[in-house]
Amino acid sequence: MRVDLVVVTHPDPEAAERLVSNLVSRRLIACGHLLPRGTSLFFWDGSLQREGEVTLLLKTIPENREPLEKEILREHPYQVPEILFLAADHVTAAYAAWVRESCTAGDGSPTGEGGVRGPA
């Protein structure tokens, strides 16, 4: 089973936490980890920029890449946000199974378009 680690930076810690909560609720990700605020340095509009940002580490399944990207782009305040999808070389079988179960409707099918598993 494959698992993706998705790296996203965000300027607002509270908005970033709301974003992660939304993504977990919609089963686009199994979990998200918010790293403490750090400093990013980059060129934008021809000049060096310095921004305080939190880094999000999101775990998902490859089938959710497109809907996850769309949702992040929809909610993110940046014109060009950092969204990096990294395929894990190796993941323990139990963790991969948990990620898949957390990102699916329980039948192995992704719920990537925002479907949330309803009552059984």
Language-model-detected regions and their locations in the chain:
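Positively charged, small/polar-rich N-terminal and surface patches that mediate targeting and assembly
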Residues: 1-120
